[in-house]
């Protein structure tokens, strides 16, 4: 997605389409870049079709058969493209799935590696309010001289928000 707001606006559409993904994770560009520096591997594209990627959704689908999963993938791809995704990348091998989730799992360590002082806040907000809440948090962080890095479970509104600073003292 070009921006986080567009990515997050997609999430409720999965429920409206009666899809039930196993997981829907959101990731901002900066946290993906930090992860890549930390693990030493590029997993997610930085640019597609000449457009810089600003945010990502990592969607996990499950079904009773390969045909059912393939149909869900097609339905999900159509849904996200209609909602403004730049493109759809399918992790169609176990290696690609492992790489995607390994990158996602490294986010906290990547933040810690690059940040002198950080504090974590886990919150749960309604799925349709995630973008609004993160806009508020980012604006407040900026006003306080903090860099905010966030990622989380967009499917259930469980957000991991990190207030980061390399300039402030702990006191």
Q: What feature does the model see in each segment?
A:
Residues 1-171:
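Noncatalytic alpha-helical scaffold of FAD-dependent oxidoreductases
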């Amino acid at each position: 997605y070009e921006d986080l707001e567009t990515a997050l606006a997609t999430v409720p559409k999965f429920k409206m389409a009666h899809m039930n993904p196993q997981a829907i994770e959101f990731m901002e560009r900066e946290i993906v870049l930090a992860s890549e520096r930390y693990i030493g591997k590029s997993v997610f594209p930085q640019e597609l079709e000449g457009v810089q990627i600003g945010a990502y959704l990592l969607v996990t689908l499950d079904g009773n058969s390969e045909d059912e999963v393939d149909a869900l993938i097609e339905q999900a791809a159509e849904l996200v493209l209609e909602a403004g995704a730049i493109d759809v990348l399918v992790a169609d091998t176990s290696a690609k799935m492992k790489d995607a989730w390994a990158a996602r799992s490294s986010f906290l360590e990547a933040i810690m590696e690059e940040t002198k002082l950080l504090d974590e806040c886990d919150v749960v907000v309604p799925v349709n309010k995630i973008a609004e809440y993160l806009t508020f948090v980012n604006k407040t962080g900026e006003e306080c001289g903090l860099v905010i890095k966030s990622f989380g479970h967009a499917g259930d509104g469980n957000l991991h928000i990190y207030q980061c600073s390399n300039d402030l003292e702990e006191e």
